[in-house]
Amino acid sequence: MARIMMKKAHNESISEAFEGFMLSAQSRGLTDKTLASYRTHFHSISKRLDIEKPISQLTKKDLEEMIAKMREENLTDTSINSYTRTLKVFFSWRNEERIL
């Protein structure tokens, strides 16, 4: 099956990009539990990362600062690892779709 390439606007926010990720995840048939987990994780991430920032301007430093905030708030390593794992899946999807 041919892949449909869609060009994304350079000013797409992290939040908008995540909604695209969720739509794709839903269309691929991921379980409701997985989708709910992604949403919960993104909600937590959004408390520590400016999700209205254009995704094209997201830097490694932004992510490191987010993780540092989580550590300052005494989140467990398990929680932090869960949130970063969700971000890794999100970024992998963006890369696979060639929209990073």
Listing of model-derived features with the role each one plays in the protein:
Residues 6-15:
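A detector for short, charged/polar N-terminal pre-domain segments
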Residues 2-5, 19-33, 39-100:
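N-terminal core-binding DNA-recognition domain of tyrosine recombinases/integrases
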